[in-house]
């Protein structure tokens, strides 16, 4: 098992500036160089992460290869191996390439149902192979913690860092009270860059809203957000 670098995984790409900000600020705080597992390396290079991560490792796409997809589907069904898909996707950071510490980029990943299986599988896979995992900078809906598979997943992490008090309190109330920490989103530690204010700006009378592209993408009425 390798101990020279720390792996960051479950990164949704730098086009999602929330993820980019967490990785950017986290890389500046870590005591060792970070390897970033990503499915959008060119996007990450375009934004702020190129000089901060020691290298990018591209996640393997199992869906693009019919033979590979069929083989791993049969392996999962016949051998009852729920994590074999993740072992293929993450082959460059698991198995013989395993690192001791792996940090899951939290953000609001646990707020999306289509992410949950991968989050659980990756955490379980790393632990089965003897590595440690940290869920960093996360927000989790309290209702989600009523699901047994999510509770099992939370208990598997070696440490959890919640980025706001609602998640921290919900974890404690659910019985996850060991090695959990409350710390503001590390994006607040990013270097400040002053920009010219728009015409009509009135100090103390303005309200700024940071609109996620995901909100726009999921509009039920096109254009209603903006």
Spans of model-derived segments:
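Active-site anion-handling motifs in enzyme catalytic cores
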Residues: 1-226
């Amino acid at each position: 098992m390798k101990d020279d670098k720390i792996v960051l995984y479950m990164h949704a790409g730098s086009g999602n500036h929330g993820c980019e900000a967490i990785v950017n600020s986290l890389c500046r705080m870590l005591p060792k160089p970070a390897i970033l597992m990503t499915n959008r390396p060119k996007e990450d290079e375009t934004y702020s992460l190129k000089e901060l991560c020691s290298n990018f490792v591209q996640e393997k796409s199992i869906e693009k290869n019919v033979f590979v997809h069929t083989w791993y589907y049969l392996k999962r069904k016949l051998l009852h191996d729920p994590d074999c898909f993740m072992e293929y996707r993450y082959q460059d950071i698991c198995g013989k390439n395993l690192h001791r510490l792996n940090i899951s980029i939290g953000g609001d990943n646990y707020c999306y149902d289509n992410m949950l299986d991968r989050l659980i599988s990756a955490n379980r896979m790393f632990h089965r192979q003897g590595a440690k995992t940290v869920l960093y900078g996360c927000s989790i809906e309290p209702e989600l913690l009523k699901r047994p598979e999510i509770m099992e997943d939370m208990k598997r992490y070696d440490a959890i860092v919640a980025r706001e008090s609602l998640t921290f309190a919900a974890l404690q109330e659910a019985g996850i009270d060991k090695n959990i920490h409350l710390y503001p989103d590390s994006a607040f530690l990013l270097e400040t860059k002053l920009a010219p204010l728009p015409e009509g700006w009135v100090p103390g009378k303005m309200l700024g809203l940071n609109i996620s592209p995901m909100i726009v993408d999921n509009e039920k009425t096109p254009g209603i957000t903006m």
